């Protein structure tokens, strides 16, 4: 008999969790409190039951080839970066293609999730739901929490002295949808993340003036890179390998140099404060808005008056009408009891950011409580792939006693300052995907690929690390993965080819040639230079009568 799995939430992680359950012959039931699927990607003029929704102008930050489900590419005519409407259309196509909608119970709120009395033997959960005022109870063999990390707005008003005196409008970005109501006003946006940058840029087109306050600064990236290709398509295994083997100081220095080549972040008031961790945001227009004076960068807020803001550097901005906090969200699981509720919000102690460490049975998975240097959608899909195989007993995780001991030890070390708290850091996309798929048995074997299929292996290692790579082998293998990888650049260029133009000759082809072959040629060149230097030393040693046969065998110079 198939195990029953409760999936809470029908957003991007909920949809992939339903599909992963079906792939493993589990029986999913998804509970969604709103009237439609898609989570925050389903735009609404006003929040439904306080749910977070996208603002109208939102455009994706990760290109389509790097942010799709691993066995369901975007259509080739979809733009590389798309509006929320287009992205929701993709989710609809995915749900309809795999027949996921029939497993979703809409307008159903999960009230409680509690362990059954025999949990230590069965791992079962009792889930209480409410639909139109009527409550229902059901027993499930496993639970996947897919409510995301944008439930409860973080509005730290107590951290801002004098804010109770401020007479203007105060709101969190969760309430922001369209800019029309802010026309002609002087606005302060607090917080420089992706949302803060987007909101400030959009408002700068109609506001009298926009001020953007940040404590730490940020590196601002464009969506496009060398040659106009999407920046994310430069995220390769080769680059990831270099970042791991090269000295971290050199990597940081080079990163800073590259960012400042585009524009000097210090001149624009965006540079990272000393001692702070590097933070990157994606925004194509923010530098131009600063350059044109539409947005004024400010330090952190020191004090509020009735209509003015005092900043840490002593400057004062008067006649402020609106303050918008883009200060993020708190993790919230109101349907859990303590201590499970608190443990699940501490993502740093979740085993591989998925499983709570204190459960005797690994039948509860927290899906999507991650920050990545790549697509969250892809990360949640692989979390779900792994979790469903754990539920089925095909993958194992360490005993709860061991996990809890390690979690407590880690928390103690963080409190004592021995190790850093990395809970707010973004995980490296490729490393985390490799880690999860290693558990599944779906991580691509690069050396084997080079032996069996050199063309594919080349694209896998030196090309963009697209999700299709993790469907080449192992459980969940997809027959279309190879073709998807070899045609990913075609789908990238296709939506741009809307006008017939004369074919460019040398510049474009040379650029592509250098991009493809430059790194390998450099490595080979360095090896040749190294071997040449050894050869010259051998010749010199021979001439000086210091020749040793071991030099030829090992290519290692010996002291005379």
UniProtKB/Swiss-Prot annotation:
The chain crosses the membrane at residues 519-539. Its cofactor is FAD. The keyword Endoplasmic reticulum applies. GO terms for biological process: energy homeostasis; negative regulation of fatty acid oxidation; xenobiotic catabolic process. It is found in: Microsome membrane; Endoplasmic reticulum membrane. One of its GO terms (molecular function) is flavin adenine dinucleotide binding. It is a single-pass membrane protein. Its main location: membrane. Detected in liver and kidney (at protein level). Gene3D superfamilies: FAD/NAD(P)-binding domain. It catalyses: N,N-dimethylaniline + NADPH + O2 + H(+) = N,N-dimethylaniline N-oxide + NADP(+) + H2O. Keywords: Endoplasmic reticulum, FAD, Flavoprotein, Membrane, Microsome, Monooxygenase, NADP, Oxidoreductase, Transmembrane, Transmembrane helix. FAD binds at residues 9-13, 32, 40-41. One of its GO terms (cellular component) is endoplasmic reticulum membrane. It comes from the Eukaryota. NADP(+) binds at residues 60-61, 195-198. It holds the Pfam family FMO-like. Its EC number is 1.14.13.8. This protein is involved in the oxidative metabolism of a variety of xenobiotics such as drugs and pesticides. Belongs to the FMO family. PANTHER family: DIMETHYLANILINE MONOOXYGENASE. This is Dimethylaniline monooxygenase [N-oxide-forming] 4.
């Amino acid at each position: 008999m198939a195990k029953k799995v409760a999936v809470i939430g029908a957003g991007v992680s909920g949809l992939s969790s339903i599909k992963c359950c079906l792939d493993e012959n589990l029986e999913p039931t998804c509970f969604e409190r709103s009237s439609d699927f898609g989570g925050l990607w389903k735009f609404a003029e006003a929040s439904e039951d306080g749910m977070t929704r996208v603002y109208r102008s939102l455009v994706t930050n990760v290109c389509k080839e790097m942010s799709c489900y691993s066995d369901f590419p975007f259509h080739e005519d979809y733009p590389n970066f798309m509006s929320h409407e287009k992205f929701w259309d993709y989710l609809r196509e995915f749900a309809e293609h795999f027949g996921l909608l029939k497993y979703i119970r809409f307008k159903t709120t999960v009230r409680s999730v509690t362990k059954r009395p025999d949990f230590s033997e069965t791992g079962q959960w009792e889930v209480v739901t409410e639909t139109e005022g009527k409550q229902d109870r059901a027993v499930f063999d496993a639970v996947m929490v897919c409510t995301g990390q944008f439930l409860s707005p973080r509005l730290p008003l107590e951290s801002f002295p004098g804010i109770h005196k401020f007479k203007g409008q105060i709101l969190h970005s969760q309430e922001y949808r369209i800019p029309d109501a802010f026309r002609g006003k002087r606005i302060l946006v607090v917080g420089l993340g992706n949302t803060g940058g987007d909101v400030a840029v959009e408002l700068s087109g109609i506001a009298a003036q926009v001020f953007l306050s940040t404590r730490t600064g940020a590196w601002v990236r464009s969506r496009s890179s060398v040659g106009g290709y999407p920046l994310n398509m430069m995220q390769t295994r080769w680059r990831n390998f270099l970042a791991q083997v090269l000295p971290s100081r050199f990597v940081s220095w080079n990163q800073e140099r590259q960012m400042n080549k585009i524009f000097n972040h210090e001149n624009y008031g965006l540079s990272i404060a000393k001692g702070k961790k590097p933070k990157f945001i994606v925004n194509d227009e923010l530098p131009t808005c600063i350059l044109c004076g539409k947005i004024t960068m400010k330090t952190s807020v020191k004090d509020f008056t009735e209509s003015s803001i005092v900043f840490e550097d002593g400057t004062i901005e008067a006649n402020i009408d609106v303050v918008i906090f883009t200060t993020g969200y708190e993790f919230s699981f109101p349907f859990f009891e303590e201590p499970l509720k608190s443990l699940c919000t501490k993502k740093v102690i979740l085993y591989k950011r998925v499983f709570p460490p204190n459960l005797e049975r690994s039948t509860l998975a927290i899906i999507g409580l991650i920050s990545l240097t790549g697509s969250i959608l892809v990360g949640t899909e692989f979390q779900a792939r792994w979790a469903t195989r754990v539920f089925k007993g095909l993958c194992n995780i360490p005993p709860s006693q061991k996990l809890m001991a390690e979690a407590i030890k880690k928390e103690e070390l963080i409190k004592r300052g021995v190790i850093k708290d990395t809970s707010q850091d973004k995980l490296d996309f490729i490393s985390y995907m490799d880690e999860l798929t290693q558990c599944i048995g779906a991580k691509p074997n690069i050396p084997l690929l080079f032996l069996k299929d050199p063309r594919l292996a080349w694209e896998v290692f030196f090309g963009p690390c697209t999700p299709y790579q993790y469907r080449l082998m192992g459980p969940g293998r997809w027959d279309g993965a190879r073709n998807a990888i070899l045609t990913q650049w075609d789908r990238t260029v296709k939506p741009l080819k809307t006008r017939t133009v004369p074919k460019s000759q040398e510049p474009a082809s040379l650029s592509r040639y250098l991009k493809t072959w430059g790194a390998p040629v450099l490595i080979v060149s360095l090896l040749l230079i190294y071997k040449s230097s050894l050869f010259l030393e051998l010749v010199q040693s021979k001439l000086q009568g210091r020749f040793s046969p071991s030099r030829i065998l090992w290519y290692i110079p010996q002291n005379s």
